[in-house]
């Protein structure tokens, strides 16, 4: 087992070398000059230190906004008014050798590629209609090869590109989501893995959502849907009216390290298509992508690395030059105009031993070499990453006490025009240094001598120009540990801001993730940013060989003390810590192990619930107002709730989303077909397609279902697809009443039919949904329901009056009275007044059930 110490403290000591903007951002965001469809399909990319954003265009133009920090944007400017680009769907831009290439599908009628000499245009059409449906996305791989991805009838398609204007034959690389329309691919590469965001099923549906797939084999094959995480971005419950999340782009933030996903949300459904801009952080637990969103409350602004844009006239005292002729030109870039010298310009800003740095370079002379300086102490001790334009290589060298040693020489793949602007990116962690040119990994060297120092630029026997330069003490995702992580969300345990634990590697199908090895006396501390002042539930995903005890502190106050985490026989399990009170905004949460030891993998932080009242509905005349989400046709007939075919209905408002442990039960009877049951721990329900199709949306939810068919009982998990957990043979018939009950406590589910003393199914889910609403679901059958009762298992009773008979008389003969947990407390009703306050089930001789309150 590979173990290494977590070194956060050293990074935090370096934090003053970067600056932040205090205002932050809050989703969704409005922009000046939004078009008729708002900020649909936002694409953001970075060029020479500036971010450029493009969205779906209107009838005559495509707009572009600009920012240096992803929060403060200027514009828009019209970047394209070419007649071919009317209603330009999802425009995306790539920079390559001095040209900007925009790919778009005007009105969804096939793709065109337009070109420009500037990211702000004007873009003009350079191709005929290239077809390939909609939502084109381009990846340039490390070997310089280009790939084109787009939506198709069978899912996401991939095509090789022989040049920036030519698209080859397509291949299906990701199947359609749920067999329905799938779109919006966004592919990027990190640490030799290919990550793809994609979305569906209909952009006008509130259930429009984002999935992720990962490939370790290549850009045209091997993409594996991450079912454990999908949908990775979804919101349909109505919290802050955020719906329809998808079609975004990935960009590295101004700290040079943190990834961000920029996407849109749907404001209106039906005929409307107005969308707004949203942005959330991506975290990395090893190779595992963690989506810290969606958020609707204020997030801290991205950290901005120490930088220089040379947008002035004088170089200034913050720079030191040696030899050559250095000066700022056009308030835009630094130029070195003496081709005879070996010269350097370094920025007097201390750089950490672990760092990320970005440079922008362009050759103006001939021959020689030019590039980046790092770890500069003085003129006799420094490291360089120099481009040799004649050989089309980048050479990494270390000079110590005046003696230069070549550490590595790597080819710059693909077509390379040195007279155009190019970027160099360095990532140094411990003694390992990665070098990228134009975001393509060229190679990795060992540079043990480079510890700290300055960054800058250098020329050798040539002239060159140099643009935006920046450096950050963060590398390989380390910046996120100091971030106030949003709650609710799923937190990686490894994203602790402070811990004295070690890491252990967790194998994934495509790489590795990390868990914390917490022994007695160890702790893990997290900066968290809570949506609101309320209670939260924390599902700890852990494993242990023996029982362990933990406590939880928030802002140094104990909120959970000495809770036992049962032994898991070293397999992963989840234990939910309930009702942790958090103030809205920033807090510090600390988990301490008191006894034993655990490996802590993730923390599923969800909004809790303060509901303790029993919720009931007898459907005497109408449907209770407690039912807040209805799909399909639901009516009350003769005191029964009826669904004629497909549908689902959920009890409780958004305040019920945090309910964890409870008993839910009801009576059921069927028409000619049998296929219906109880939903529980449900979140994010939606209907299918633009027309809110109840049949298509039958499985569009996250939660559990316990149901009856004519020949079985079945327990399943629905995560916008269906996964059967347990099925047992049993016979159920039309026009007979059955009493069905589910009891869910922690990650254990017990399911009953008629016999309330013996569950037909007992199941423990190692990775459960920890909270959610309850409801009913029917699938292609006429089903009726009565005497619906939801009882929170909180250890207290609230809002329950004294015992009384139901309004419908019930025969005293041959009946039994039961508690909701199935315990028989009386044979008949002669002594009903002596029963404690509560809710009871009366079983009559004809098999019907009535509720007593």
Description of each model-found segment:
Residues 22-182, 189-194, 198-239, 254-307, ...:
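Beta-rich carbohydrate-recognition and catalytic domains
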Residues 1-23:
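Bacterial Sec-dependent N-terminal signal peptides
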Residues 20-21, 301, 608-612, 796-812:
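Intrinsically disordered, low-complexity repeat and linker tracts
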Residues 286-537, 542, 546-577, 583-586, ...:
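Extracellular glycan-recognition regions
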Residues 797-853:
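C-terminal outer-membrane/trafficking sorting elements
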Residues 126, 147, 292, 405, ...:
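Generic structural signal for well-ordered beta-strand positions
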Residues 209-284, 437-464, 752-780:
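Aromatic sugar-binding interfaces of carbohydrate-active proteins
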Residues 595-599, 847:
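Short acidic/polar inter-strand loop motif in beta-rich domains
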């Amino acid at each position: 087992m590979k173990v290494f110490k977590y070194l956060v403290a050293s990074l935090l000591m370096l934090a003053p070398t970067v600056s932040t903007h205090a205002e932050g951002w809050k989703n969704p965001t409005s922009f000046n000059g939004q078009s008729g469809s708002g900020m649909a399909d936002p694409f953001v990319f970075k060029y020479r230190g500036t971010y450029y954003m493009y969205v779906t265009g209107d009838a005559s133009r495509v707009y572009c906004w600009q920012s240096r920090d992803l929060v403060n944007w200027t514009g828009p400017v019209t970047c394209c008014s070419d007649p071919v680009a009317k209603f330009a769907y999802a425009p995306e831009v790539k920079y390559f050798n001095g040209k900007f290439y925009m790919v778009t599908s005007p009105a969804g009628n096939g793709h065109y590629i337009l070109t420009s000499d500037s990211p702000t245009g004007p873009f003009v059409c350079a191709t005929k209609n290239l077809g390939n449906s909609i939502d084109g996305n381009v990846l340039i791989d490390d070997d310089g090869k280009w790939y084109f991805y787009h939506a198709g009838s069978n899912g996401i398609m991939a095509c090789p590109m022989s040049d920036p204007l030519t698209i080859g034959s397509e291949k299906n690389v990701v199947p359609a989501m749920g067999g329905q329309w799938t779109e919006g691919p966004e592919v990027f590469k990190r640490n030799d893995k290919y990550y793809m965001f994609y979305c569906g099923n209909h952009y006008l549906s509130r259930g429009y959502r984002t999935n992720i797939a990962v490939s370790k084999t290549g850009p045209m094959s091997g993409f594996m849907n991450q079912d454990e995480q999908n949908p990775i971005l979804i919101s349909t419950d109505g919290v802050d009216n955020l719906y329809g999340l998808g079609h975004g782009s990935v960009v590295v933030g101004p700290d040079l390290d943190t990834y961000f996903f920029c996407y849109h949300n749907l404001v209106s459904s039906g005929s409307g298509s107005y969308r707004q801009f949203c942005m959330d952080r991506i975290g990395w637990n090893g190779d595992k992508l963690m989506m810290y969103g969606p958020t609707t409350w204020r997030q801290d602004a991205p950290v901005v690395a120490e930088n220089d844009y040379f947008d002035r006239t004088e170089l200034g005292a913050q720079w030191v030059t040696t030899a050559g002729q250095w000066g700022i030109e056009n308030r835009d870039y630094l130029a070195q105009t003496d081709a005879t010298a070996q010269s350097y310009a370094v920025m007097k800003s201390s750089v950490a031993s672990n760092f990320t740095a970005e440079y922008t370079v362009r050759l103006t002379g001939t021959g020689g070499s030019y590039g980046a300086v790092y770890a500069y102490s003085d003129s006799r001790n420094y490291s360089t990453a120099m481009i040799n334009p004649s050989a089309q290589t980048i050479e990494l060298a270390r000079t110590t006490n005046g003696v230069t040693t070549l550490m590595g020489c790597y080819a710059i793949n693909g077509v390379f025009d040195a007279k155009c602007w190019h970027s160099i990116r360095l990532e140094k962690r411990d003694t390992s240094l990665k070098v990228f040119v134009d975001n393509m990994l060229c190679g990795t060297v060992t540079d043990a001598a480079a510890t700290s120092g300055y960054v800058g630029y250098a020329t050798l026997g040539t002239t060159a120009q140099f643009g935006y330069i920046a450096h950050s003490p963060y590398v390989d995702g380390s910046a996120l540990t100091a971030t106030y992580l949003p709650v609710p969300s799923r937190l990686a345990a490894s994203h602790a801001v402070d811990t004295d634990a070690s890491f252990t590697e967790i194998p994934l199908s495509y790489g590795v993730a990390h868990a914390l090895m917490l022994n007695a006396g160890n702790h893990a501390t997290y900066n968290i940013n809570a949506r609101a002042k309320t209670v939260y539930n924390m599902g700890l995903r852990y494993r242990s060989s023996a029982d362990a005890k933990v406590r939880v502190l928030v802002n140094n106050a104990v909120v959970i003390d000495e809770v036992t985490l049962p032994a898991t026989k070293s397999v992963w399990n989840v234990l939910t810590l309930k009702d942790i009170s958090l103030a809205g905004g920033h807090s510090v949460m600390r988990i301490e192990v008191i006894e034993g030891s655990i490996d802590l993998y993730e923390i599923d932080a969800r909004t809790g619930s303060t509901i303790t009242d029993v919720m009931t509905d007898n459907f005497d005349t109408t449907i209770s107002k407690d039912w807040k989400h209805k799909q399909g046709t639901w009516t009350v007939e003769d005191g029964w709730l009826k669904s004629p075919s497909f549908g689902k209905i959920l009890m409780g408002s958004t305040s019920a989303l945090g309910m964890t442990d409870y008993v839910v039960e009801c009576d059921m009877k069927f028409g000619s077909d049998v296929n219906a049951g109880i939903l529980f721990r449900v979140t994010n329900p939606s209907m299918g397609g633009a027309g809110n199709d109840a049949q298509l949306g039958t499985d569009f939810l996250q939660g559990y279902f316990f149901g009856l068919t004519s020949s079985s009982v079945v327990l399943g998990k629905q995560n916008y697809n269906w996964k059967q957990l347990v099925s047992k043979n049993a016979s159920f018939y039309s026009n007979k009443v059955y009493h069905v009950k589910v009891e869910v406590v922690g990650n254990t589910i017990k399911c009953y039919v008629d016999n309330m003393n013996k569950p037909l199914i007992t199941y423990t889910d190692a990775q459960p949904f920890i909270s959610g609403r309850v409801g009913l679901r029917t699938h292609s059958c006429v089903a009726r329901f009565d005497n619906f009762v939801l009882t929170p298992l909180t250890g207290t009773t609230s809002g329950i009056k004294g015992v009384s008979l139901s309004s419908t008389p019930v025969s005293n003969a041959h009946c039994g009275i039961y508690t909701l947990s199935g315990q028989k407390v009386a044979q008949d009703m002669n002594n009903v007044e002596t029963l404690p306050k509560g809710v009871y089930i009366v079983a009559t001789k004809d098999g019907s059930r009535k509720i007593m309150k």
